Amino acid sequence: MRIFLDSHTALWWMDDPEKIHPKARDAIRNPKNTVFLSAVSTWELGLKVSKGKLLLPSDFPQRMAEDGIEELPFTNAHAIAAISLPPFHGDPFDRALIAQCMEESLTFATRDGIAAEYRITVLPV
């Protein structure tokens, strides 16, 4: 399985994995699966840090990489897919992540119920 972490899932994975449903946690830990984190998520979390809404270690990307989580860049194709999505979701970060899931055929590890409205596979966390 190719798993794509939503921003909150990545944060919980690093801070408090027990917040993640055991089935999702096992899937993320399974070495047979490939797990991805978007540069969009790092940007989203970084903005929350800059606004004082979140504390995030400066080595966040490095720690994710140490856990075997691969970075997924945000491309022009992803951007075009995001602006072409039906308007179920208004959050631009979530729309970008959903577009990446669609374009890359990834399973989205999220607690966001709106994500299921799109043509993606969701792994509930």
Give the role of each language-model region.
Residues 57, 69-114, 120-125:
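Active-site neighborhoods of divalent-metal-dependent phosphate/nucleic-acid chemistry enzymes
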Residues 37-38, 74:
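Short glycine/serine/threonine-enriched helix-capping/active-site loop
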Residues 1-37, 50-62, 104, 113, ...:
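Short, well-structured N-terminal submotif of metal-dependent ribonuclease cores
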Residues 12-13, 48-49, 85-86, 100:
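A generic structural signal for short
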Residues 45:
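Phosphate/NTP-binding elements of NTP-utilizing enzymes
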Residues 28-29, 64-67, 81-82:
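Helical cap/lid subdomains and adjacent loops of hydrolase enzymes that gate the active-site channel
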